[in-house]
Design a protein with these regions (language model features):
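Extended, low-hydrophobicity, polar/charged segments
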Residues: 1-194
Length: 194
């Protein structure tokens, strides 16, 4: 409700100070984390967190550097997949009764990091394929931010019509909609995918 950015900054500092005093007086060990501003929008949102096994949020926290963020907005510092020096041609492998990354890794005797997992979401009534490493999961809050909201996972009964495959066999090859790949796949090649 401030009339200027300077006033907003001052109000923010006063609220921050008040919260810190409350937590200090309660004797709570707390930390401030970057957070999603949610439906209100905007930037620079922060939350005060107290470590607890009975909370509703999960926080990424680094004791050595002090970085802390709600997992909805946490930035990954995990290395990308290393590129093989020689790119192989695309080829098909029959994987009968294989319906998950774990089953695929067991069947092919490979590591999850060699797999590119696909998930299909619907954005404004159009399919979008999300491609990530086999051991990763989609962060739907970040996906909504990238796509601009109005996003939902495709229903199981929609998958065959959209991709021609069942949930455990979907891949990017031949997919006709938009594809969004995780940054960790930036230079990856020779991956196994549905």
């Amino acid at each position: 409700f401030d009339t200027s950015w300077e006033g907003l900054d001052k109000s923010y500092e006063l609220h921050d100070s008040a919260y810190r005093k409350i937590f200090d007086r309660c004797g709570l060990k707390y930390f401030v984390v970057g957070a999603s501003s949610g439906a209100m929008g905007g930037t620079g949102s922060e939350e005060f967190m107290v470590k607890s096994a009975a909370g509703e949020d999960t926080v990424a926290y680094c004791e050595s550097c002090g970085y802390a963020a709600n997992v909805e907005v946490a930035a990954s510092r995990i290395d990308s997949v290393e590129r093989d020096t020689e790119s192989k041609s695309i080829y098909e492998i029959s994987t009968p009764n294989v319906h998950s990354i774990d089953e695929l890794c067991e069947f092919l005797k490979i590591d999850e990091i060699q797999c590119a997992k696909s998930r299909i979401y619907i954005h404004d009534e159009k399919p979008v394929l999300i491609l990530m490493l086999g051991n990763d999961e989609v962060n739907e809050t970040k996906l909504e931010k990238v796509l601009g909201g109005n996003v939902r996972p495709a229903h199981p009964e929609e998958l065959k019509d959209i991709s021609g495959a069942d949930a455990g066999s979907i891949g990017p090859v031949g997919f006709s909609g938009r594809i969004i790949a995780d940054n960790r796949l930036k230079d990856a090649n020779n991956m196994f995918s549905g």
